[in-house]
Amino acid sequence: MNKVFFFFVLSLVAVMVNAQQNRIDVIGSSAPELAAFGRFNIGVTTIDVVSSNTVDVINTPRGGETAYYDRALTLEIWYPANLRGEEPGTVYEVITRNPDIRATLTGRAVRDAEPLLSGPYPLIIVSHGYPGNRFLLSHTGENLASKGYVVAAIDHKESTYDDQQAVTSTLYNRPLDQRFVLNSLAQISSQSEGPLGSMIDADNTGIIGYSMGGYGLVNNMGGGFSEQ
C-alpha cells in the first residue's frame, strides 16, 4: 500500500510540475506510437513575410474604391537542427484569447539553432483558427520537426487574438495567406536565401488547417465559394 501511495504522489507531483510549466513536449502514456518525438534535434526561428499590394478588405467601403495595403505575416518556423552544445529547450510567450493575459509554453526546440543541412526536408504549413495565433499548434510543430519536417506556422493578420478584425478579412485572406506563405518559402528555397534556404523542399508541402485554417485549406484544394 505504501508503494502504491508513494507512486501516486510522485505521479501527482509530475503532473503539477508539467501543468505549471505548460510543457508542450509531454507525450502521454496512452498516446499512439507515432506520437513519440523523432530522432532530430529541433530549432525554431521567427521570420516575417510581406504580401505587397493586397486588397485591404477592412478599409474598402461597400461599393467604393478598392483599398490596398502591404500585408505582413509573422511565421514561427521549426526545423531539424544541428546543436553545438546547446541544451534543448525554449520558452514561448504567447498572447491568449484575453490579450491582457500571457501564457508561457515550454518546449524542447532551441531558438535560432543552426539548421541541419542534410535535407531538404518536406514543408508543413500550419494555419490557425479565428481568432488564434501561430503558437496554437506549437506542440505539433516541434514534434514534426523532430521527424524531419520544416514547419511554418502563420500569424494571420487581422485574425489573431491581439489583432482580430471583422471576419470578412479572414474569409477573403485565409486561403491567400496560405498560398502566399508557400510561394514565399518556395522562393527562399529556390534562391537558397538565409540559413533555412537549402532546407526546404517546397515541392513536397502539406497544410494543417485548424478550424478557419481548414476552411482556407479546402478552398486551396479546389473547394469554391458560393455566390452568397
Question: Residues of each region from the PLM?
Answer:
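Positively charged n-region of N-terminal signal peptides that target proteins for export
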Residues: 1-4
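N-terminal signal peptide c-region/cleavage motif recognized by signal peptidases
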Residues: 14-16
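Divalent metal-coordination and catalytic microenvironments
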Residues: 77, 144, 178, 205
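Short substrate-entry loop that stabilizes the transition state in hydrolases
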Residues: 108, 112-163
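Alpha/beta-hydrolase active-site loop
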Residues: 136, 167-203, 218-219
